[in-house]
């Protein structure tokens, strides 16, 4: 678990992962300052913490396909959003991760 997740005391369960969406620029290309209501949700996020994992039919632990610190692509509307200490996070299932960005 990352230092950030440890200090927040958030531990996802099962095959869920905790991610933090990347911030969208607050200024448009033309220099116009965008209000929060005009910003769209980003589909890129950093993996902050991993859950305990999923088990197969024989009880063997299946490895996660991502690691803490990876930048992943998730659907804009997936997961459970939560705010902790003023920071916004999303808990998503591993199956909701579309890709790992290299």
Curated annotation (Swiss-Prot):
Main localization (coarse): cytoplasm
Cellular compartments annotated: Cytoplasm
Gene Ontology CC terms: cytoplasm
InterPro entries membership: Chaperonin_GroES, Chaperonin_GroES_sf, Chaprnonin_Cpn10_CS, GroES-like_sf
One Gene Ontology biological process: chaperone cofactor-dependent protein refolding
Cytoplasm in keyword set: yes
Known function: Together with the chaperonin GroEL, plays an essential role in assisting protein folding. The GroEL-GroES system forms a nano-cage that allows encapsulation of the non-native substrate proteins and provides a physical environment optimized to promote and accelerate protein folding. GroES binds to the apical surface of the GroEL ring, thereby capping the opening of the GroEL channel.
Protein name, per record: Co-chaperonin GroES
